[in-house]
Structures are given as structure tokens and as C-alpha cells.
Design a protein with these regions (language model features):
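Bacterial Sec-dependent N-terminal signal peptides
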Residues: 1-23
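Assembly/interface hotspot detector across virion components, adhesins/toxins, and nucleic-acid enzymes
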Residues: 3, 15, 111, 115-121, ...
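A local structural micro-motif
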Residues: 9, 47, 114-116
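N-terminal leader/targeting segments
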Residues: 18-85
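Short beta-strand segments that buttress and anchor functional surface loops
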Residues: 57-59, 130-134
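Long, charged/polar, surface-exposed segments that mediate recognition or autoinhibition
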Residues: 67-127
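Short, exposed beta-strand-loop hairpins at the edges of beta-sheets
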Residues: 132-151
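Short, solvent-exposed mixed-charge patches
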Residues: 158-159
Length: 159
């Protein structure tokens, strides 16, 4: 029981102490291989991937249906996204280490605003994203961000 209580207090620290996703990590993603390298090195585990979509999660459940954070890559168009779950909790307990907020701040300060673009998915429906063109990015397209149901999403809109 004592070990369990220690684990409960240590879990948030362990979760947030991982090597977090950065703006520079995202700028380097130019294809499926670099996406996989990034998520694997950041500690993500493969979820229920298909031939067309690669799903990776942090803190992935045994049945691979739930995770604290998600990353997805669509093989048909090289679209990708990263989702940090429960921003309110992360902001409160991570002592300023909310990687979604850090990445959004860097996008807004170093990239050029493009426009608001809609992205539709079966999970979230239609969502408006603020998009930017980032010089030095290896991907072809616009990087967007939005908050959806309390989660922070960084999304590539490929050209």
C-alpha cells in the first residue's frame, strides 16, 4: 500500500519529466520515418494503427484505446497531429511545462500567420485551426493549433 501511495504522488512528476515534444521536433518532420523517430524517441507507444493511419500514445492503456497524449500520421497525405490531453490539469500541475502552450507560443512568435482553416474528423467533427507558415520547416504545408474539448492540438495542413 505504501508503494502505491508513493506511486500516486510520483506519477505526475514521472509523466511530465519525460522528454517533451518541442517546436523544433515538429519542424523536422518531413515524412513518416521522421514522424516515427520523433514519437518513439519521445516515449510514445504504438496504438491501434491501420494501413492508412499510424496512432501513437503516451501512457497508453492496455487495450490501446486511451492515452494521456496522442500522435497520428496519415500515410496518404503525410498529415500529422499531436494532441496534449486535459490542458487544465497539465497547466495546473506541470509547473509551466505544458508543451502545447510552449509550442503555440513559438509558432506565434516565429512563424507567419496564414489563415483560419477547418479540419474535419470523425472524432471531433469540424474544428477551426489558426494556421501559420513556418520558415525552415521540413514539411510542406501549414502548422495549425486549436483547443478541442479541453485538449491542445497541433495539426499539419499539408499542401
Amino acid at each position: 500500500m505504501k508503494r502505491f501511495i508513493i506511486f500516486l504522488f510520483a506519477f505526475p512528476y514521472i509523466l511530465f519529466a519525460q522528454d517533451q515534444l518541442t517546436f523544433n521536433d515538429i519542424l523536422k518532420i518531413k515524412n513518416q520515418d521522421i514522424f516515427l523517430k520523433t514519437v518513439i524517441e519521445k516515449g510514445y507507444s504504438e496504438g491501434n494503427s491501420t494501413a492508412n493511419k499510424l496512432y501513437y500514445g503516451l501512457g497508453l492503456s492496455k487495450d490501446k484505446s486511451e492515452a494521456t497524449d496522442w500522435a497520428e500520421f496519415t500515410t496518404l497525405n503525410s498529415e500529422f497531429y499531436f494532441e496534449q490531453s486535459n490542458l487544465e490539469y497539465v497547466r495546473k500541475y506541470s509547473e509551466g511545462k505544458c508543451y502545447y502552450d510552449q509550442i503555440v507560443s513559438e509558432i506565434k512568435s516565429t512563424c507567419e500567420y496564414n489563415k483560419v482553416m477547418k479540419h474535419s474528423s470523425s472524432k471531433n467533427g469540424s474544428v477551426n485551426f489558426t494556421t501559420y507558415k513556418c520558415s525552415g520547416a521540413k514539411y510542406k504545408g501549414y502548422l495549425g493549433f486549436a483547443q478541442v474539448d479541453g485538449n491542445g492540438v497541433i495539426q499539419l495542413f499539408p499542401k
